[in-house]
Amino acid sequence: LGILLAVVLLPYFQTLFRTQASLATLLNPSLLILLIFSVLLITLIAGGYPALLMSRLGTLQSLKGKLQVNGKNRLRNSLMVLQFGIAILLISGTLVLWDQVEFMRTKDLGFNKDQVIAFPLNGKLNDQKAIELLRNTLQDKPNIVSITASNNILGIGKDGNRTTSVLGFEHKGRGVDTHMLVVDADYVETLDLNIIEGRSFRKNLVSDSLSVIINQAMAKQMNEDDILASQITLDDASYNIVGVIEDFNFQELDQHIAPMTLFALPNWNLRNVYVKVTSQNLEQAYDDVKTAWNTIEPNVEFQGSFLNENIERTLRNERTMITMIGSGSVLAIILSCIGLFAMSLLIVAQRRKEIGVRKIVGASVSAITVLLTKDFLKLVVIAFLMATPIAWWTMNKWLQNYPYRIDLNIWIFLAAGGIAVLIAMLTIAV
């Protein structure tokens, strides 16, 4: 039955977790031996423990039912606590992961990600020529605000591409490293980057080919009293710093903002275009850009997407992790419910006479329900008290991987415990 379910569910598993896993993996001798050993071990534990109890009680006592009324079954209760503890741990992890991903998805990254369409220049035309034609084609469109380009793309593009360039140089006798970004005119304005000192690049200003704009992290690394009076020397060429922009997240959010330097180098390969559009009609603006691209490059697929989609693609690993832990939570909950349901049937059978007497003396259905559920709820509470510190420590350690992260609060773990209690009560009620 398990193998049959695996065959049926495998395509969904591959889609859900974006994996090429197949049942052929099980033909590996090591895995096959491990699988057979696991089945035998589970069978031995599942059947061996009841057999051990029966051998201790003796045949006559077992037939009389003394096995069923064996007082407090510590092993049974311990296993239930373990099951619900794992479920609460996984539910807590899923909630924390979800909150962290939502935080990263909605975080202000320091640039306009909602009104900017980005796409690669992957056609036959020269980059500069393609940019010029795009500007000419889109200049009369009311939905288009500005067009610029750069040699790198923000986030992960629709084509799956992500590039970055890092260079090092000497500044006053010490090494300095910076990310290098070559941009076209209007880059700062198109992305709504915030200039905190100096100015942006100016169109048709020849001297700006030897000018740079740096971010705050780069300014801090250079440690100059008057940063706008400083220069960067590369390959015997000196570049004047004409502006400082506020730090923005040009890398994934599991990394601190690194030093960044913007260059306006002429005739450089600018492989990515950014088009800022109005917020009134995003869909029409996207269609206008796509039509313009198809006009100048009719034989090349348009691979444009809004920057917020590019940023969303950088969160794939986290979303896959949510799916995996969430699936584990569901599985743990199902197993806990099965065990709890079996236990409730067993308890009812054991206390049948007691329940009958209570009904005769006038006990209500709700009173009997409370009587039967309070012991189970105690197990869930114990599981919560044991699992919560572990979940808190584990998730706090995981969050340390992110410079930009949520703050853990008790409500997340209370919600996980509440879900476990609700599931337990619904299972018993059934």
Question: What is the predicted role of each segment?
Answer:
Residues 7-37, 67-78, 268, 279, ...:
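Membrane-helix entry/capping segments
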Residues 1, 75-100, 319-353, 381-382, ...:
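Hydrophobic alpha-helical transmembrane segments of multi-pass inner-membrane transport and secretion
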Residues 99-119, 158-159, 189, 194, ...:
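Membrane-proximal juxtamembrane linkers immediately C-terminal to transmembrane helices
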